[in-house]
């Protein structure tokens, strides 16, 4: 397990060694001891798995209380994954980072205090992630995916959105972390 820094404080791309031969491959997809060395985090409580069709955009989601750290990975297909730092005390507050995730064994560590979302680039994509806290619907928030102030470069897309994601708050209006 190796970490590659991103442009946002405390967020990392994480790679794992993959061993391939004529039979297939072996990949240790997660190792808590190694992950804790990189991030200091050792308290995952939930695993989630979603499947999305091409053009679906999910997010940008976060919990204002019981903030969730997320270790995300795309296991089939391809997504454009975006995170936004909502921690007022962070030097990268209000900045975003985007990366394409696919079957290339990259994980993205999304620390607590970030909004997270992704856009499906292929016919379908399966996305798995671990969280450091449970889902609490009463604290669930959505940051508007196409907020002008943030200026996230999604490319020229017409996404399929849930009603919840259509009604996201602008960066100026959204709840933030102290």
Task: Put a short name on every predicted segment.
Residues 1-103, 122-124, 129-178:
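Non-catalytic, conserved peripheral segments adjacent to functional cores
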Residues 101-122:
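Conserved metal-binding segment of the jelly-roll/cupin
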């Amino acid at each position: 397990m190796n970490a590659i820094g991103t442009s946002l404080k405390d967020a990392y791309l994480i790679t794992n060694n993959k061993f391939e031969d004529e039979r297939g491959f072996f990949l240790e997809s997660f190792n808590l001891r190694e992950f804790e060395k990189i991030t200091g985090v050792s308290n995952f409580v939930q695993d989630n798995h979603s499947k999305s069709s091409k053009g679906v955009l999910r997010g940008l989601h976060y919990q204002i209380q019981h903030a969730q750290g997320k270790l995300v990975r795309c296991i089939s297909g391809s997504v454009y994954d975006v995170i936004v730092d909502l921690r007022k005390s962070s030097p990268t507050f209000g900045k975003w980072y985007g990366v394409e995730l696919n079957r290339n064994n990259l994980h993205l560590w999304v620390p607590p205090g970030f909004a997270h979302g992704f856009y499906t680039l292929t016919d379908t994509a399966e996305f798995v992630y671990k969280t450091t806290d449970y889902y609490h619907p009463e604290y669930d928030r959505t940051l508007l995916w196409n907020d002008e102030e943030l200026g996230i470069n999604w490319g020229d897309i017409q996404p399929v959105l849930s009603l919840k994601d259509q009604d996201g708050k602008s960066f100026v209006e959204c709840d933030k972390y102290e």
